[in-house]
């Protein structure tokens, strides 16, 4: 599908100018044309507009369980969350709109646009995402790192429980490495 869109701009902030730009859209999603080929891209949340509503509802949840119910809206494409309540419950969730993709492909690489079976239609349910609720260790850590090392080792989600096609990151951030090197006592003392 090819169309044209007019974009009004101002040159140097003074001179009005209208630019006409070609817009290409495929069954996979928007298309970017370059000198070396055309690339369609598809990402979760590309039509999602409910983030403000979800933030609002999250702020009024009175318990981890109420918060989890709000999180089932799944309006955020990717955002790690940690929450706690007055009853001492804590939770980490690698919250994302993770596509349910066809197995057998390296989803980090370019894939053939001619194969419509590669157009994913669904995302993982909230309750199927990597999460830790009330770990025995008593703590969770979130520093933009893998969801498989967020608390004491016995309580971490098992990467083998998730398909490779989910694309969950296995890398550790520097802050996460430093945070996990501290024991709980040192971690608590560093914040007080």
Task: Show the residue positions of the predicted features.
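Mature extracytoplasmic enzyme cores
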Residues: 1-192
């Amino acid at each position: 599908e090819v169309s044209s869109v007019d974009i009004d701009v101002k040159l140097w902030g003074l001179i009005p100018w209208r630019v006409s730009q070609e817009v290409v859209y495929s069954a996979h999603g928007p298309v970017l044309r370059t000198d070396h080929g055309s690339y369609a891209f598809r990402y979760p949340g590309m039509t999602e507009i409910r983030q403000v509503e979800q933030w609002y509802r999250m702020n009024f949840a009175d318990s981890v369980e109420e918060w989890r119910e709000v999180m089932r809206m799944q309006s955020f494409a990717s955002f790690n969350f940690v929450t706690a309540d007055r009853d001492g419950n804590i939770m980490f969730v690698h919250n994302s709109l993770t596509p349910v993709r066809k197995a057998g492909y390296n989803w980090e690489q370019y894939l053939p646009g001619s194969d419509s079976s590669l157009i994913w239609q669904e995302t993982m349910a909230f309750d199927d995402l990597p999460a830790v609720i009330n770990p025995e260790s008593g703590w969770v850590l979130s520093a933009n790192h893998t969801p498989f090392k967020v608390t004491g080792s016995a309580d971490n989600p098992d990467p083998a429980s998730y398909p490779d096609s989910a694309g969950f990151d296995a890398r550790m951030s520097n802050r996460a490495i430093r945070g996990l090197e501290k024991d709980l006592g040192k971690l608590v003392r560093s914040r007080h």
